[in-house]
Amino acid sequence: MAANGLMAASSVFLHRPVHPHFSFSSRTNQMVPLGFKGRVSFIGNVKRCFPVVLSMGKSETFEEAGNSVAPGNGISIMVNGCSGKMGKAVIKAADSAGVNIVPTSFGSVEEAGQTVEVCGKEILVHGPTEREKVLSSVFEKYPELIVVDYTIPSAVNDNAELYGKVGVPFVMGTTGGDRTRLYKTVEESKIYAVISPQMGKQVVAFLAAMEIMSEQFPGAFAGYSLEVMESHQASKLDASGTAKAVISCFQKLGVSYDMDQIQLIRDPKQQIEVVGVPEEHVSGHAFHLYHLTSPDKTVSFEFQHNVCGRSIYAEGTVDAVLFLAKKIRSKAEKRIYNMIDVLREGNMR
């Protein structure tokens, strides 16, 4: 798939190993040794591939659900972390969808007082000390406000507590933080929220398929060993939330694996030469590989999903905003929703 400079690929393959010690590089189709610690195995051309097909129940459409929300229909968003690349990408996607962008954002102490220009809009950044007063004022001025959070992992919990205190609905795209505390905070606040470790709709669909498989076939991979590699831009400090979600499914399928075994690749040189990340996307990509091997080494499975750019996440975030606005207007239950809920709603732009 290619759109707006974005390339995304999600694949699920069952295949026989081409060679027990080598696998193909996705870019060069040259064989790469698998014995080193940072081994990766992005498949180029594998002859014996069998698609795994899983089905889900019929999704409810916006027409069936009623209370549909057209893009830009009175919705206003405040993007916290607007100076970052994801924040800017969301603003551009929301602006294209006709959603009103509030000219206010939260940032670090160093960013306080700065103005960020995105899509011809000047957005004033406020520091931590004045957040509650500013957010309350913005929410009063824009009663259909939805906050979008793309800040930093260390700010996740404090930000969620603030949103709950003010009562403003939000979409949390920031990963990291104390997730147990995050969910507890939002549940106790009884507000509308979409929280997901992954905002890319197609990747979320893959995650949903993994969930279905783990629920329907628990223990199917008992005894298998698992290797997980994920490569992101160097600015991403934490391990991939998506990788953790997929690993959780494998654990339900009977695989023993600790999250600290995830191979994080952040070195640009290795990303280009070994992983196969296009050089122009080193500063913004998300490559994931999961390799399963049977106890006797005669069977192997590989699952991979690779994304270059940020458009897929920005577009998914806007869909989450529209979904949340619909829930608010229909007076649906105030609770935490996720991107699978957004997908099941059935309105993909």
Curated annotation (Swiss-Prot):
One of its GO terms (molecular function) is NADPH binding. Pfam families: DapB_C, DapB_N. Keywords: Amino-acid biosynthesis, Chloroplast, Diaminopimelate biosynthesis, Lysine biosynthesis, NAD, NADP, Oxidoreductase, Plastid, Transit peptide. One of its GO terms (cellular component) is chloroplast. The active site is at residues 232, 236. It is an enzyme of class 1 (oxidoreductase). (S)-2,3,4,5-tetrahydrodipicolinate binds at residues 241-242. It catalyses: (S)-2,3,4,5-tetrahydrodipicolinate + NAD(+) + H2O = (2S,4S)-4-hydroxy-2,3,4,5-tetrahydrodipicolinate + NADH + H(+); (S)-2,3,4,5-tetrahydrodipicolinate + NADP(+) + H2O = (2S,4S)-4-hydroxy-2,3,4,5-tetrahydrodipicolinate + NADPH + H(+). The keyword NAD applies. It is found in: Plastid, Chloroplast. InterPro entries: DapB_C, DapB_N, DHDPR_bac, Dihydrodipicolinate_Rdtase_pln, NAD(P)-bd_dom_sf. NAD(+) binds at residues 81-86, 173-175, 196-199. Its main location: plastid. Pathway: Amino-acid biosynthesis; L-lysine biosynthesis via DAP pathway; (S)-tetrahydrodipicolinate from L-aspartate: step 4/4. One of its GO terms (biological process) is diaminopimelate biosynthetic process. Its EC number is 1.17.1.8. Catalyzes the conversion of 4-hydroxy-tetrahydrodipicolinate (HTPA) to tetrahydrodipicolinate. Belongs to the DapB family. This is 4-hydroxy-tetrahydrodipicolinate reductase 2, chloroplastic.
